[in-house]
From Swiss-Prot:
Pfam families: APH. It is an enzyme of class 2 (transferase). GO terms for molecular function: ATP binding; thiamine kinase activity. Pathway: Cofactor biosynthesis; thiamine diphosphate biosynthesis; thiamine phosphate from thiamine: step 1/1. Belongs to the thiamine kinase family. The lineage of its organism: Bacteria, Pseudomonadati, Pseudomonadota, Gammaproteobacteria, Enterobacterales. One of its GO terms (biological process) is thiamine diphosphate biosynthetic process. Its EC number is 2.7.1.89. Catalyzes the ATP-dependent phosphorylation of thiamine to thiamine phosphate. Is involved in thiamine salvage. This is Thiamine kinase. It comes from Escherichia coli O157:H7. Keywords: ATP-binding, Kinase, Nucleotide-binding, Transferase. It catalyses: thiamine + ATP = thiamine phosphate + ADP + H(+). Signal peptide: none annotated.
Amino acid sequence: MPFRSNNPITRDELLSRFFPQFHPVTTFNSGLSGGSFLIEHQGQRFVVRQPHDPDAPQSAFLRQYRALSQLPACIAPKPHLYLRDWMVVDYLPGEVKTYLPDTNELAGLLYYLHQQPRFGWRITLLPLLELYWQQSDPARRTVGWLRMLKRLRKAREPRPLRLSPLHMDVHAGNLVHSASGLKLIDWEYAGDGDIALELAAVWVENTEQHRQLVNDYATRAKIYPAQLWRQVRRWFPWLLMLKAGWFEYRWRQTGDQQFIRLADDTWRQLLIKQ
């Protein structure tokens, strides 16, 4: 149920107006990019979410609601309410583990997602790379960063192998191991893009695991594994730049030292992979 209002409301106003019988259960972190809180009434639970990035346009939050509205409940939480700065979605019971599931199981989930109707908006990385450069701490901007940005701008993004709806933030913390199978949460970066971009963006433990995931996916998608892996590798510089830039952006936004450490580590990976 979308509810349009130009005036933001407080948490207490949200609960009293739309969920008067529900009460907050606990507050929990949803990964690096923000938090949510849980509400409950007679065993029914919802997650109340706010935009992770307070500086992001409201349209980005609305896109997340629209993506969840069209996705099947077997892979994503169903949304119940959207209004400015707030979204209420189903709570997905299950276990969130600290490591990825079996690569074949994960490949099956991603392949099923990629068979769904497209969302209707494209993921384009270059505008994000440029935004993160512009919004980063000037003292952290380097000649090497600018050189790499110009190189990618000139090269342009790889031509999609297959265009599908993507989650774009697949890591252990966003996977719920439920009784009915794997499900994905935290869809803030969802959009249409290359299936190889999704596979390249998965937060894997090592190259061997990455190759196995790509091979398992290729079997399901009836693509030559070597062809798919080549396409995945084409996205690596883009994704490493995206991660590094995002960490730099979040460092300036929050002052949290963990983002500097993550940025420095990603810059080192980028130099290795060049």
